[in-house]
Every structure is written in C-alpha cells, then in structure tokens.
Amino acid sequence: MDSKWAALLLLLLLLLNWGHTEEAGSWGEDQVFAGEDKGPHPPQYAHIPDRIQTPGSLFRVLLQAMDTPRRSPAFLFQPQRFGRSAWGSWSKEQLNPQARQFWSLAAPQRFGKK
C-alpha cells in the first residue's frame, strides 16, 4: 500500500472517530482511564500549544508528512557509472568504422501523415 493512501486512510479513520466522540459527548474528569494520572501534562509537552490537537492541525501535519521529499526523481535517471566507457563521454572516435558510417546516415524518422 502506498504511503499516501495509508495516510489518507488514517486521516479518514481519525476524522470518523472524531465525529463519533463529538456525538457521544466529550470525556469528563470522571471518565479517565484507571491507568492515567490526573496531574498536569508532563514537562516534555509543556511547550506544545493546545491548538495543535485540533482536527485541522492533524490534517495539516499529515499533508506535510506526505509532501516531504524522499529522493529526487532525477535519481532514477543517473548515467551508468560502471562498465565500458563509464568515465568518459561517447565520441565518434571510440566507435568502430562501420558504426561511424551508420551514424552519419542516420536521420530523424517521420511518423504519421506524410
């Protein structure tokens, strides 16, 4: 599965779940899980403002994650690095005499209507 499709599926599930929690009512202080403490947020999250937890900000973060560049598309079209004449460019002197005659006669072909 492509990472973009996975991110969109995650976003869709997140938004659907968000809608269900809004209908059922928000969690109150008496509905906290047994394993959670009721104290303030840990200091590691103190610098994060509360607006980051909105659905719009979650959507924005997912879109930014999808748009991060992984590799340049030019990476796929690199010249051959190993093999014959890998360190230099082609020249007509490197070709044998028969190939030189062939390339001198080569002309662009016309396809389609004449």
Curated annotation (Swiss-Prot):
Key words of the record: Amidation, Cleavage on pair of basic residues, Neuropeptide, Secreted, Signal
Pfam families (UniProt xref): NPFF (PF15085)
Name this polypeptide is given: Pro-FMRFamide-related neuropeptide FF
Alphabetical list of PANTHER family matching this protein: NEUROPEPTIDE FF, PRO-FMRFAMIDE-RELATED NEUROPEPTIDE FF
Compartments (UniProt record): Secreted
Coiled coil: none
Alphabetical list of InterPro entries matching this protein: NPFF
Organism annotation: Mus musculus
PTM sites of type Phenylalanine amide: F82, F111
Similarity section: Belongs to the FARP (FMRFamide related peptide) family.
Purpose of the protein: Morphine modulating peptides. Have wide-ranging physiologic effects, including the modulation of morphine-induced analgesia, elevation of arterial blood pressure, and increased somatostatin secretion from the pancreas. Neuropeptide FF potentiates and sensitizes ASIC1 and ASIC3 channels.
Broad class of where this protein is predominantly found: secreted
Any GO BP: negative regulation of heart rate
GO cellular component: axon terminus; dendrite; extracellular space; neuronal dense core vesicle; perikaryon; postsynapse
Propeptide, residue positions: 22-69, 85-100
